[in-house]
């Protein structure tokens, strides 16, 4: 199975100033994608560019980093807006069997669903991130 995982916020930043981590290999989404990979599936992980690690890393699956736009309104630490989501999913929807996107309130989840409603699952993490908007 070929899986696309769209998770712009790779780790929770408690402030608007996102401190870039050296690696994403300790994140939940990395482990999530690694599990799919270890089960023999082809995985592509999409993250927001502000969360791209400071050190160059190699991964056993493809990782794409997309630019977050309109950052004054759609702040990357709480409501990242990556317009590339819609166009990429629309263009490549036939290549993927499953599209998993994170957060029900995400603009990227909406775009993925609009481009491929029959393949998109929206996964919502009920953790610290929800309180950022308060």
Tell what function each PLM region has.
Residues 30-34, 90, 128, 133-134:
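Membrane-proximal helix-turn-helix segments that form the acceptor-binding/catalytic region
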Residues 51-55, 130-132:
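Short, charged/polar "capping" segments at the starts of alpha-helices
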Residues 1-52, 94:
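N-terminal subdomain of nucleotide-sugar transferases
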Residues 56-90:
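A short, charged, and often flexible helix/loop element on the N-terminal side
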Residues 89-108, 119-122:
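Short N-terminal targeting/anchoring amphipathic segment
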Residues 6, 46, 66, 123-125:
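Generic beta-sheet signal
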Residues 3-4, 98-100, 113-131:
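Active-site proximal beta-strand in glycosyltransferases
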Residues 12, 72-73, 107, 120-134:
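A short, histidine- and acid-enriched strand-loop-helix "catalytic/donor-clamping" loop
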């Amino acid at each position: 199975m070929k899986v696309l995982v769209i998770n712009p916020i790779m780790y929770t930043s408690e402030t608007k100033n996102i401190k870039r981590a050296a690696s994403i290999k300790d994140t939940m989404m990395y482990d999530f994608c690694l599990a799919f990979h270890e089960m023999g599936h082809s995985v592509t992980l999409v993250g927001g560019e502000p969360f791209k690690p400071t050190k160059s890393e190699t991964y056993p699956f493809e990782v794409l980093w997309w630019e977050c736009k309109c950052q004054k309104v759609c702040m990357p630490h709480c409501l990242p807006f990556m317009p590339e989501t819609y166009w990429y999913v629309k263009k490549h929807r036939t290549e993927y069997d499953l599209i998993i996107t994170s957060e029900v309130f995400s603009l990227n989840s909406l775009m993925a669903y609009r481009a491929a409603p029959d393949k998109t699952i929206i996964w919502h993490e009920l953790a610290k991130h929800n309180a950022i908007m308060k």
